[in-house]
From Swiss-Prot:
Gene Ontology biological-process annotations: gluconeogenesis
Cofactors: Mn(2+)
Originating organism: Clostridium botulinum (strain Okra / Type B1)
Molecular-function annotations in GO: fructose 1,6-bisphosphate 1-phosphatase activity
Chemical reaction(s) catalysed: beta-D-fructose 1,6-bisphosphate + H2O = beta-D-fructose 6-phosphate + phosphate
Gene: fbp
Top-level taxon in the UniProt lineage: Bacteria
UniProt-listed Enzyme Commission number(s): 3.1.3.11
Name assigned to this protein: Fructose-1,6-bisphosphatase class 3
UniProt similarity note: Belongs to the FBPase class 3 family.
Keyword Flavoprotein: no
Cross-referenced Pfam families: FBPase_2
Keywords: Carbohydrate metabolism, Hydrolase, Manganese
């Protein structure tokens, strides 16, 4: 450490107002010096473990388990601590106990003959494991992670060695007393949760919490309780955020996707969205229509014929409303350049055809009872009334609004963190691999400036309630981020939803990807992006989601010689037959980067009862010769700045520029 140069008094004088404010927190040479010592010590601690997960798609059971087992980190810690001294079955049971302490304890109490003995052995093991996982943190940080009921006891046990002769009786008596007063179960639950918390210092969710899975609201509820998290919004997140902001086109899309996959639990049970008006509307207008192309796609769901018929009618009804609402945005925003997606006016109902890109296609469904051929994008009176009711439901759902505010507070379109660049979709590129310029609000933007602008507009969509014009533009932009040709979240030229419903020709269903995906394996592209985002190309990685890695076909998630890592989690069951696995997660600890591939998860019930974990295979991507310290991280840079400021404060005290507060007057 180099102390601040006392001769640079002009710098100190220039910052005197700030230093006087800082002196309120550190009112003496002694307190400022102590803090410098503390901060300098923290810099030399090992870097905390980061856990990267992407594309959860509402699959809450798989995600919950992944969160609890930290992509295998807890199992590896158990192996490190206990090695061959424990049988594999004992290690498995210990891991399951840490993941699901309440449920596992219920089972053990029913089957264990000598419960007190089991408690004693288990408590020793959990304390030993907790000592190891907490060893890279300061006592202060560990203390903050402890539950209030057991904070003092856990801290005592973590900081004492049970094999030390002079403290052995003290250590043992604590454990025996916990058992004697019938608090062992509560203590096991508490320390298991502490272990779960301490094994991961930072959680990164790289998009798509929402989609077709049944429990997005359960996932966000769990994430909102996490101690340290950031989120990079995905395309499915942004459409829900737009819906919560009141964007009617986003609301229609959210409902359509939910109906497409017969997943109404998130809407109805999770957020209390009333879909009865839509059901009534659909039965009135599509009563005689079997809506064959709108039958829900279901996995592991047993729906009766009556349910399927109703969902199909609702699905078609909201789809037509969606196309009308999207048409209004396209006409309102010519700068989006999406006129080719205006298809309702290209329908010839009499002939049963669609004029698409100057080519005539036969429609496989010609029943459009709400379509006015003179004004095809106008909602009829019943549709307008329905859209108003649905919009009110979304805007007035307390839980949905709370969850979306959480996404805004903890999320962004991209994140630079510890020399890594995290984003869900892509950075829009031209065919030649250069950054694509996009004109928004009369500004021509590309790369970082484009994403920064889109991030601001997404926030205006939700928060600018007193500026209707800015809010409307922001909401339109949320829809564009969902499906626009230059959206960094969508990453494709067009979304062919209409064609998939109404045309048989598979060629019309194709969605051409942005050239970014063609260049993902090119180190030069990665270097260009690193430079654009002001990152060191030699020591940085792009961590990406969105597109499932087709491992089954030999695709490698490691691109561009390790510069770009694709970790689409594969949580979505519909993708697993294509990918061959349940996707990838990433761990970045003080020793390097570990990429973990996962097999499909059975269920939480089987995990608890049978000890079934997610079968995972870990690849070491990078291994550093000397452990990374806090000083090598973004937090380290902030701490260095704090030390610099405190050193200036010390000089100000010693030169008499700021007077120390009398020790007797300092209130602790």
């Amino acid at each position: 450490m180099t102390l601040y140069d006392e001769n640079n008094l002009h710098i100190i004088k220039d910052n005197l107002r700030y230093l006087k404010l800082l002196s309120k927190q550190y009112p003496s040479i002694s307190s400022a010096s102590s803090e410098i010592i503390n901060l300098q010590a923290i810099l030399n601690l090992p870097k905390g473990t980061e856990h990267f997960i992407s594309d959860v798609h509402g699959e809450y059971e798989s995600f919950t388990h992944m969160l609890k087992n930290a992509s295998g980190v807890i199992k590896r810690k158990i192996d490190d601590v206990f090695g061959t001294s424990l049988r594999e079955c004992d290690k498995k049971n210990l891991a399951t106990l840490i993941y699901y302490p309440e449920q596992k304890l219920d089972l053990i109490k029913k089957s264990e003959k000598n419960l007190e003995d089991w408690y004693k052995i288990t408590l020793y093991r959990l304390i030993r494991l907790c000592q190891i996982v907490s060893s890279k943190y300061t006592r202060s940080k560990v203390r903050k992670s402890l539950p209030s009921d057991f904070a003092y006891i856990i801290e005592e046990l973590l900081n004492e060695q049970g094999d030390r002769v002079d403290k052995q009786e003290y250590y043992n008596s604590i454990i025996e007393t916990i058992i004697d007063i019938d608090r062992a179960s509560e203590f096991i639950i508490a320390i298991s949760n502490v272990i779960q918390r301490l094994v991961v210092d930072k959680l990164h969710i790289i998009g798509d919490i929402y989609d077709r899975g049944p429990g997005a609201e359960i996932i966000i509820e769990a994430l909102s309780k996490h101690h340290s998290i950031d989120i990079q919004w995905g395309n499915h997140d942004i459409v829900w955020m737009g819906a919560a902001a009141g964007c009617e086109a986003c609301i229609a899309n959210v409902i359509r996707i939910s109906l497409r996959y017969a997943n109404l639990s998130t809407l109805e049970d999770g957020y209390g969205i009333n879909l009865l008006p839509l059901a009534t509307f659909a039965m009135d207008f599509y009563k005689e229509d079997n809506c064959e192309n709108f039958k829900p796609r279901t996995i592991d769901k047993n729906l009766n014929e009556t349910d399927i018929k109703l969902l199909s009618k609702m699905h078609k009804a909201i789809s037509i409303i969606q196309f009308k609402l999207e048409g209004k945005i396209i006409k309102r925003r010519p700068e989006f350049k999406m006129e080719e997606r205006l298809l309702l006016d290209k329908i010839n109902i009499k002939e049963g055809t669609l004029n698409l890109s100057e080519k005539i296609y036969k429609l496989i469904d010609t029943n459009f009872p709400t379509l006015d051929k003179e004004n095809p994008y106008e909602l009829n009176e019943r549709e307008r009334d329905l859209v108003e009711k649905l919009t009110n439901s979304f805007i007035n759902s307390e839980k949905l609004q709370r969850h979306i505010k959480f996404l805004y507070s903890n999320g962004s379109l991209y994140l630079k963190y510890n020399s890594n660049l995290l984003y869900h979709g892509c950075i829009p590129l031209n065919e030649d691999g250069s950054l694509k310029e996009v004109t928004l609000c009369k500004e021509t933007l590309k790369g970082k400036s484009l994403l920064d602008k889109l991030d601001r507009l997404a926030r205006e969509a939700y928060f600018f309630k007193k500026d209707p014009e800015s809010k409307l533009y922001g909401m339109d932009m949320m829809w564009y981020l969902w499906c626009g040709s230059n959206s960094p979240l969508f990453g494709k030229k067009k979304m062919t939803t209409f064609e998939r419903y109404f045309l048989d020709d598979k060629n019309t269903h194709k969605e051409e990807k942005n050239p970014y995906y063609k260049y993902r394996n090119d180190e030069k592209m990665c270097t260009m992006i690193f430079e654009e985002f002001e990152l060191d190309a030699d020591n940085s990685h792009i961590i990406n989601g969105h597109i499932p890695v087709k491992t089954k076909e030999g695709e490698n998630p490691i691109k561009a010689n390790g510069k770009l890592l694709v970790i689409d989690g594969g949580f979505c069951k519909a993708y697993q037959p294509q990918t061959g696995i349940a996707g990838y997660t990433l761990i970045y600890n003080s020793y390097g980067l570990l990429l973990t591939s996962h097999e499909p998860f059975s269920s939480i019930h089987k995990a608890i009862v049978e000890g079934n974990d997610i079968l995972s295979s870990t690849t070491i991507l990078e291994h550093v010769s000397s452990r990374k310290r806090v000083l090598d991280t973004d937090s380290g840079e902030e701490i260095k700045k704090q030390i610099h400021d405190l050193e200036m404060l010390l000089v100000a005290y010693r030169k008499g520029l700021i007077k120390e507060e009398n020790e007797a007057n300092i209130r602790f």
